[in-house]
């Protein structure tokens, strides 16, 4: 019997632990409350810090508690142009400026936003990687929904009351600098997750992987597998409709006027 392959070890009940020892905290907007729904609340950017395992910097914002005499600190992914000592306004009546957190329904079309809520009150899940942003496309006042363009280019409809931070996420251009050597990849993934180095299946022995073995590195059989294959066999091109290079382009159909 062969050994458990990588995809089986990654499944439920895995032995791996999250690399979160030195992380500074989760990136979340402040909890939605009465002050944000009907007005705004002011906060102060205390510090902008590096969070290991995250490409974007984190901003530590101190808000005054609306009900008790104390301050509450939250960690949020920093927007490009945010600085220490800056006042951040959160709420439906906040001004439109970089770093403020407002409902997407109050923003004009074409506004660049980040840290967008998918559901009202989830404290921001969309467009949070370094340099990422979403764009407000259109509003529908009748259904109280807003259409936004995601960083992938896909369009998405969200509730107009969902909050977002104005601006794009700081740390853009991080991936433009090449890693150049294996040591940098080692430290990068040591802070992120246990996914490096990744050994190819054809470089393994036949006991360790369906693609392993042979006097030279080759798969030795078609790499396509059926959809309902067992977990230890389900590697390669899974339920592929077609394989190989896509040769040629899409045929162009001309109208009668263009043929003339």
Curated annotation (Swiss-Prot):
Subcellular localization(s) per the UniProt record: Cytoplasm
One GO cellular component, as annotated: cytosolic large ribosomal subunit
GO function terms (MF aspect): RNA binding; rRNA binding; structural constituent of ribosome
Source superkingdom: Eukaryota
UniProt cross-references to PROSITE patterns, sorted A to Z: RIBOSOMAL_L2 (PS00467)
SUPFAM superfamilies, A to Z: Nucleic acid-binding proteins, Translation proteins SH3-like domain
Keyword tags: Cytoplasm, Ribonucleoprotein, Ribosomal protein, RNA-binding, rRNA-binding
Keyword Ligase: no
Gene Ontology terms describing biological process: cytoplasmic translation
Keyword Aminoacyl-tRNA synthetase: no
Residue numbers spanned by region Disordered: 208-230
PANTHER family reported in the protein's UniProt record: LARGE RIBOSOMAL SUBUNIT PROTEIN UL2, RIBOSOMAL PROTEIN L2
Family: Belongs to the universal ribosomal protein uL2 family.
Protein known as: Large ribosomal subunit protein uL2
Taxonomic lineage from the root: Eukaryota, Metazoa, Ecdysozoa, Nematoda, Chromadorea
